[in-house]
Every structure is written in C-alpha cells, then in structure tokens.
Amino acid sequence: MTQEQIYQNIARRTGGDIYIGVVGPVRTGKSTFIKRFSELLLLPHIQNEAQRARANDELPQSAAGRTIMTTEPKFIPEKAVNIELSGGGSFRARLIDCVGYMVDGALGHEEQDAPRLVKSPWFDHEVPFDLAAETGTRRVIREHATVGVVVTTDGSVADLPRENYCEAERRIIAELEAIGKPYVILLNCTDPDSDAAHQLAAQLQDTYQRAVVPINCVAMTAEELDGILQRLLYEFPIREIAVQMPSWVMMLEPGHWLQSAVYTAMLKFAGSVHKMADIAGKNLPLECEYITKTILTGMDLASGSVHITAMIAPDIFYKILGEQTGLSIVDEASLLPCVVSLAKAKRAYDKIKSALDQVEATGYGIVMPGIEELTLEVPEIVRQ
C-alpha cells in the first residue's frame, strides 16, 4: 500500500479529519512522537512560510529524565493542516498532546511532598496535577480525537523501570476500549530492533489484542510512520462481510437445511470479528461441516468491507439434486443421463402443455402438431 493510499483510506474512514490523540503514561515519549510526526508529515505540507514557522514554534518540548514536560493538553499545530493528495482529495490532520497518566517515580506533579495544585478549565477550583492530567486525557480521547496512538515504553527512554508504567498503561487502554475508537500501541525503545523489544511487543499484543509497534520515536523515519498509520487502518471496525458462494445455494427454498447451516455459521463468524485486523492474514474458520474452505478475496480498508469466498463440498450438490428430483445422482457420471432423460421428457411435455391447460379450463384440449410432424403431399379430390 502506497503512502497516498494509506492517507486516502484513513481520510475516508474519519470523514476527512484525522485528529490523532496521542495518549499513554507520562514519560514515555508522547511529545517526542508528536514532534517527529509533525516534522515528517505536517510541516512539509504547510505552504505559507509564516504559518509553517509558527507551527514549528508550537511543537512540544521533549527531554530525557523523569520530569514531566507536558503540563496540559495541546493541539499540534493549533490549526489543522490541510493535506492535498496527488491522486485527488484532501484531509485535515493534527495531533493532540496529552499529559498522560501518572506513574511512580515521575517528577513534577508534587511540590514539597504534597500534590501540586493547578487551575484547569474543567474545574472551578484548583485540583491536584494528576487529576487535571487524567481529566484532560479523557476529554481528548472522548471528544476530540478521531483515532488514538498509545505511547508506552520498555523503560529504556527514561530513568524509570518498565513495571512502573504497567498500571497507567492498562488504565489508558481500558479507556480507549470502552470508547471504541481505533488505536494502535507504540512501544518506545532506544533499541526497537532488539529481541527483548520484540518479545515485549508480542506480549503486549497478546495481552491487549491490538497492534503493538516497537519504535524509537526520536529516530522515527517516514517509512516507519507510514507503517504505523497502515497498522492503524487495520484497527478500524468491519462494516460489512460479503460472502461469495455457489449461486445454487441461494436458489434453495427458504429454511432449507443447507442454507440454515451455512447462514448460522456465517452469523457466528461475523459475531467473532470486529476490526479489520481480526481477518487480515488469518485463517477464516466457518464452523460448518458442509463448507470445505474459506478464502479472503478482498478487503476495502476505506469502507470496512470484507469479501470472502466459501466453497461447498461437491457431493452436497449431488445430494441435494437427488433430494429435489427423487433421482439417484451421486456424481457427474450419473448426472448426465438424468439431465438428458429429463430434457426429452420436457420436450414431450411442452407439446401437450397447452392442451392440458385447456383441459383444466374447459374440459377438453387439442394437441397441435409441431412443424416437424407435418408432411405436405399432392392434394387429392375426395368425392362423397
């Protein structure tokens, strides 16, 4: 998938507004990710030099260590950037930086061993810094962001151990799950290619059932950013599942045992998948004894539609033919003579059909000869 296709699909999914809420525990690299994202994607698309310079000045500060740098939610840039696509269409994009959820060992939320009190637009009185931070993060997720990026870490980007982040990480992901907005998890590491980073990413992916991408936010490349956005596309919900199967299955009378079995399996399968990632690159087991194989034939990431082909066992076709006709049909060899015989019987019936209809209507009917049954002879004079 090309970069432009990724952006087009996300724009169609979000109605043209890609507002990415960057959330997670404090001291994980959220501001660093936003700064790098803006440098790679947003700033190059701002044509006006003055606006580009102002947007660059609005980029968040970031630093190593345990001190919290972000003090309030902030839109980056303040005004959404309109990005025109060369293939047609456009979308508006901006990111939302959050303070995040507190973790043990972080500095900046207390003063003289007491909670630091701050004024917040969501309260009419001073509240503890951590309460204001969590409230702001929730509002960003619920009211402003169209998609989410959770930034967590293996503990290598700050002077805090991995276990200090686990509780805040779990809480923020639970918030996103409750809201139902698509999101992806970034595992910020100083060495994202290490075995330890990949093992932790696999563990988190198994725990949260979401895409987890190990990455170094400081050194993130444009290709890695495209990969993150593509993974995000697969976190959008499935809107439609179209199943292709032999047309004769749909021609059976409603309530037929084969239809009931196949449709029940389809409904059960549809209830077990929710987002595009649940289907992409995976086996599609439709639990039906009459379906021999299912193949994923197409996915439209922009609309959320999935196309599947279901193959029915060949012997089922002959079994149903036998049931419907009362004839002994078990394979192609037995089918051919039956079809030939039935065709002859149909031709014979077609000759007398109109007469039979007349009999039912009037009590008698006339069978007209076909053109092939007529013979022309020399006329004879008959005297009587």
What is each PLM-predicted segment?
Residues N164-R170:
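Charged helix-capping and loop-helix junction motifs
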Residues G105-G108, D159-N164, S194-H198:
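Conserved ATPase-coupling elements of RecA-like P-loop NTPase cores
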Residues E84-G89, V140-H144, E175-I179, D206:
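Conserved catalytic network of the ASCE P-loop NTPase/AAA+ motor domain
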Residues Q3-Y7, R12-T14, I18-R27, R36-L40, ...:
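P-loop NTP-binding site
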Residues M1-E126, R142:
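Conserved G1/Walker A P-loop phosphate-binding module
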Residues V99-V103, D154-V157, T190-D193, V218-T221, ...:
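Conserved nucleotide-binding/hydrolysis micro-motifs of P-loop NTPases
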Residues R171-V184, C189-H256:
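Canonical P-loop GTPase G-domain recognition
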Residues A106-D159, E175-L176:
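Inter-motif core of Ras-like GTPase G domains
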